[in-house]
A protein has these predicted regions:
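Beta-propeller domain segments
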Residues: 22-65, 173, 190-193, 208-213, ...
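Beta-rich catalytic cores
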Residues: 69, 76-79, 98, 113, ...
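Surface loop/turn motifs at the tips and blade-to-blade linkers of beta-strand repeat domains
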Residues: 72-77, 115-121, 159-168, 217-221, ...
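Conserved beta-strand position repeated across blades of beta-propeller domains
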Residues: 74, 84-85, 128, 177, ...
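Asp-box/WD-like beta-propeller blade repeats and closely related beta-sheet repeat scaffolds
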Residues: 114-117, 123, 128-130, 140-179, ...
Length: 409
């Protein structure tokens, strides 16, 4: 008996020792870091979780084309990113990630007020508005607020069980939106920087009926799409997708993709950008059958929100062109992005990318930025709203046609 007790005691002490010897897996963003970059200090930028005073937001540094104006429209929403506009255009809802809130901004005719709709959720990044209801998507929860635009005390309906959410957090902070078909579109990113997803439920885009029924997988091979919109004429879905990290400053670029039919494969994790095989995750003919991107958005640019412009305020040349927000890199030695670009697609299907709004990134060496633009929304009057996740603000970009010069007498 004493021998058995001694063995049991020895085993009890040995088990913790063995568990302590087992190294912890690296955080998801660290995965795929090559030995050649072992000493790199690059890491994701820390977001600001406190309110930024209006006077500390240097909106005057923003640069837009002649005739356009960028101004501070609302502030006081730390971490605010994806936006959903109410049916009447008088309220804007913003999701967040780490801070766990959803905000409501009310436009009372020149003055905006901000309130928190819901708090203490796990990365409620996804917000969508449809037929008077606000939908909120967190990592592990889906809530629907009926009639919230007219009733600030509206209580949520829990739809979580209807949407079959996978458990992993990484790349599953969601952008969600209703399409022209009335369906609710939801992406499910890869739970890693670079890996073969553990199950088929990752790395895809799905669509559902508004109540969560009718689940359909419409795209696979999607690493991390956090922005999409439908072309106003073709009704095709266009979406941004982040390229993998730890591939150097000239590494795999972010993508602008177009879904022309249900079931297309966009390559992840075997094939990236314009047909580049992954150096670690390999298979025979990795790019065979993969749909190539319409345009490349730059390496590590963090291409986020996209909006096809259909308003009447901007000059005609902007009609049916796309605005895409690039939040800005962290996995490059030389910063890239931190801007809004305008994308125009020719009759040949080729896209050209032009700068539109800049100024968030400061000059000089290293990462010196005061803001990080994230998403774009179109208002009923045709103005654009751009959210800034870093300072918790929304900017309004408007256009006024220059007045004709007075004729000389």
């Amino acid at each position: 008996m004493n021998k058995l007790v001694a063995l049991a005691v020895a085993a009890a002490f040995a088990a913790p020792a063995l568990s302590q010897d087992k190294p912890k897996p690296p955080p998801a963003w660290h995965q795929g870091k090559p030995a050649a970059m072992a000493e790199s200090k690059l890491a994701p930028h820390a977001g600001k979780m406190t309110e930024t005073p209006t006077g500390d937001i240097p909106v005057s540094k923003l640069k837009v084309p002649a005739g356009f104006k960028a101004e501070l429209w609302a502030s006081g929403m730390p971490g605010g990113r994806a936006m959903a506009v109410s049916d009447d255009g008088k309220k804007v809802y913003l999701g967040t990630r780490v801070i766990g809130r959803v905000y409501e901004v009310t436009d009372a005719g020149g003055k905006r007020t901000v309130r928190v709709v819901v708090d203490k959720l796990t990365q409620p990044a996804g917000v969508a508005f449809n037929k008077g209801a606000l939908y909120v998507f967190a990592i592990d929860k889906v809530l629907k607020f009926d009639g919230i635009a007219g009733n600030p005390n509206a209580q949520p309906q829990d739809l979580t069980a209807k949407f079959d959410l996978p458990p992993e957090q990484h790349h599953n902070w969601k952008y969600v939106a209703f399409g022209p078909d009335g369906k609710l579109y939801v992406p499910f990113g890869s739970p890693c920087n670079i890996c073969e997803p553990p199950t088929k439920e990752y790395g895809q885009i799905r669509r559902y009926n508004a109540d969560g029924s009718g689940k359909e997988v419409i795209a696979t091979g999607v690493r991390n799409s956090v922005g999409f919109d439908w072309h106003p004429k073709t009704k095709e879905l266009w979406f941004t997708d982040h390229g993998r990290d730890w591939a150097g400053d000239k590494g795999f670029e972010d993508e602008l993709n177009r879904l022309t039919k249900v079931g297309q494969n966009f390559g992840f994790p075997y094939c990236h950008a314009n047909g580049q095989p992954d150096p670690e995750i390999k298979k025979a003919d990795p790019c065979k059958g993969v749909t190539r991107p319409v345009a490349l958005m730059g390496p590590h640019a963090a291409a986020m929100g996209i909006k096809w412009y259909t308003g009447k305020m901007f000059p005609a040349e902007y009609q049916n062109t796309a605005f895409i927000v690039r939040k800005g890199s962290w996995n490059r030695e030389k910063p890239f992005g931190f801007d809004v670009v305008n994308v125009r697609v020719g009759e040949d299907g080729k896209a050209s990318i032009r700068p539109f709004a800049t100024g968030w990134q400061e000059g000089g060496e290293g990462y010196k930025f005061w803001g990080r633009p994230a998403y774009v929304a179109q208002m009923p009057d045709g103005a654009l709203l751009v959210s800034d996740e870093q300072v918790g603000a929304i900017y309004r970009i408007s256009y006024q046609k220059p007045k004709a010069a007075a004729k000389k007498q």
